């Protein structure tokens, strides 16, 4: 599954109570069998079964056929299994949290410590699987699971615990504003940026970046925190590392933030982002350059200051881009990178009225 992929949902743990607006005022006429708009929603499994059986019965044509006893029994068993599955998943999460809530063994032997860590890692992995479902993710947060992750496991001694905690935070947070707000309120972003910037384990850094992305993309409060914590500088340092996956994902996030939040282009230019991106393009060619050039394109689009900085003679960007275009012409797999090069040449070096960019 991709970092920002679609996520499933399921039936609620409890059916909603009947609407107060339908049951109050107007006397007993509102509960007559005549109008489907005034019927009470089911309060239990039997009521939901009855609703499923009678659904569509008010359609005049064709008339409903009576449900066979065999089909009625199958439907009831299927729905019972669905409700039972929901309860079981919540119990699984509670069991995992009991494991994770235990204090770390202070004076255990090496074998005991390894077994304890393996059990905790297994609990985090199971939670990550369960929380792919948005309702489970919400239940996990209601069970105070997020407090445990941020408070203890992002800074755990074992790298296997740190990266699994970061992954779980990202899994729960992606595309769910309420969970994002809770995570941000717990101070997770500062810890995640520290992991991305300083952790000795590459996997921890990659998973921390995933969680950061889930907290700042399409989340204004997260982006503001990211800015206050100098997140763009951390992102640039990540792009300068030797870990290909980290470089690509960092450049992709930068490009995404530039497209979605062009108001921060001035901040990035003042940090020397143009010069640093060009320096990255000058490194040995790799697929990572596509995302760097994409970020550079986003930085100069409709932004004269970015264009002026790209034109600085000491950068030698025009010559670099023309040489790169020649290199990529015969390679179909680099078509997007070639298009970014051509767009940069057009935007920064092909305008007949250069002075107009200074206005």
Swiss-Prot record:
It comes from the Eukaryota. Interacts with the ATP-binding domain of HSPA1A. Detected in a ternary complex containing STUB1, HSPA1A and HSPBP1. Interacts with PGLYRP1; this interaction blocks the cytotoxic activity of the PGLYRP1-HSPA1A complex. The keyword rRNA-binding does not apply. The modification Phosphoserine is found at residues 351, 356. Residues 1-71 are annotated as: Disordered. This is Hsp70-binding protein 1. Ubiquitous. One of its GO terms (molecular function) is adenyl-nucleotide exchange factor activity. Keywords: Phosphoprotein, Repeat. ARM repeats lie at residues 132-174, 177-217, 220-259, 262-301. InterPro entries: ARM-like, ARM-type_fold, Hsp70_NEF-Inhibitors, Nucleotide_exch_fac_Fes1. Residues 23-37 have a biased composition (Gly residues). One of its GO terms (biological process) is positive regulation of proteasomal ubiquitin-dependent protein catabolic process. Inhibits HSPA1A chaperone activity by changing the conformation of the ATP-binding domain of HSPA1A and interfering with ATP binding. Interferes with ubiquitination mediated by STUB1 and inhibits chaperone-assisted degradation of immature CFTR. The keyword Repeat applies. GO terms for cellular component: endoplasmic reticulum; extracellular space.
């Amino acid at each position: 599954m991709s970092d920002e992929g679609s996520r499933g949902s399921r039936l609620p743990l409890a059916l909603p109570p009947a609407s107060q607006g339908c049951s109050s005022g107007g006397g007993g006429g509102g509960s007559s069998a005549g109008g489907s708009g005034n019927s009470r929603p089911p309060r239990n499994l039997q009521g939901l079964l009855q609703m499923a059986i009678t659904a569509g019965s008010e359609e005049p044509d064709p008339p409903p056929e009576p449900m066979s006893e065999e089909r009625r029994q199958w439907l009831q068993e299927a729905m019972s299994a669905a409700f039972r599955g929901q309860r079981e998943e919540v119990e699984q999460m509670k069991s995992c949290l009991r494991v994770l809530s235990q204090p770390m063994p202070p004076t255990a032997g090496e074998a005991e410590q390894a077994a304890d860590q393996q059990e905790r890692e297994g609990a985090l992995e199971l939670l990550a699987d369960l929380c792919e479902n948005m309702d489970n993710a919400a239940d996990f947060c209601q069970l105070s699971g997020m407090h445990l992750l941020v408070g203890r496991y992002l800074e755990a001694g074992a790298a296997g615990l740190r990266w699994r905690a970061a992954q779980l935070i990202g899994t729960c947070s992606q595309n769910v504003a309420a969970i994002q707000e809770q995570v941000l309120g717990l101070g997770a972003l500062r810890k995640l940026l520290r992991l991305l910037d300083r952790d000795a384990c590459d996997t921890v850094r990659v998973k921390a970046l995933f969680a950061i992305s889930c907290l700042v993309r399409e989340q204004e409060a997260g982006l503001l925190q990211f800015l206050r914590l100098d997140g763009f500088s951390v992102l640039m340092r990540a792009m300068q590392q030797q870990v290909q996956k980290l470089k690509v994902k960092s450049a992709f996030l930068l490009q995404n933030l530039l497209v979605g939040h062009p108001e921060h282009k001035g901040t990035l230019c003042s940090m020397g982002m143009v010069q640093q991106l060009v320096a990255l393009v000058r490194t040995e060619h790799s697929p990572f350059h596509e995302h760097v050039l994409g970020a550079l394109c986003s930085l100069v689009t409709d932004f004269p200051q970015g264009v002026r900085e790209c034109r600085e003679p000491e950068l030698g960007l025009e010559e670099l881009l023309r040489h790169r275009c020649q290199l990529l012409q015969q390679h179909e797999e680099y078509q997007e990178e070639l298009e970014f090069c051509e767009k940069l040449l057009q935007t920064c070096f092909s305008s007949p009225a250069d002075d107009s960019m200074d206005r």
